[in-house]
Amino acid sequence: MKNEEYWNKRAASYDEHVITEYADANEQTVSRSLAYLKGSDEVLEIACGTGIMTLGIIDHVSHITAIDISSAMLDRLREKTEGRYTNLSLMHTDIFDHEFDDKKFDVIAAYNVLLYMENVSEVLRRIHSLLRPGGMFLSASDCVGGIDNADAAEKRRRVEKGELSFVGFFTPDELAKTIEKAGFTVLESENIHEGTPNQFIAAKRI
């Protein structure tokens, strides 16, 4: 199953699951992100999903371009935001869209998606290229490397069954080092979730 198909199927129940399992982590992700955001910021949010994080930060920035490969996830976000925001653009695409080639952003956010990207190093280099000098990269990601629990087992099962094409089993330290290798200075790296680590990372473009 392609990742887009998987996330389209998850869209209807996604909020219920994530809000239940990651309520505190979501709140911390938003509050920690706000410490790095300014009212003048142009933000690109990768894999915005149903907009849980989008809605948490949109009132604090100039504009968000929110993108996702799942049309169903974007439909859910569109339902939540229709007619409410003039500083939000939704796009059914990914970060390698050539439309972004000549654009620069103050902040790029990738919440709870890096572990599903087999080409994560390439993605991080692309993020670096789309940020203005000194721009910020904000991320939160489950880090299941070295973890032996039901969540890690379920992620392995989904890959084995072909529901997901890839899950990265990296540790928080490995993820931070991968981000640094892409040309960033990590300013903050903190686990914000009990159980499976959900690592919030704020990194500045060098």
Enumerate the predicted regions with their spans:
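Short alpha-helix
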Residues: 166-182
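Core SAM-dependent methyltransferase catalytic element
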Residues: 182-184, 188-206
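A conserved beta-strand element that flanks and buttresses the S-adenosyl-L-methionine
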Residues: 109
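Conserved class I S-adenosyl-L-methionine
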Residues: 1-38, 138-163, 193
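Short catalytic micro-motifs in class I SAM-dependent methyltransferases
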Residues: 112-113
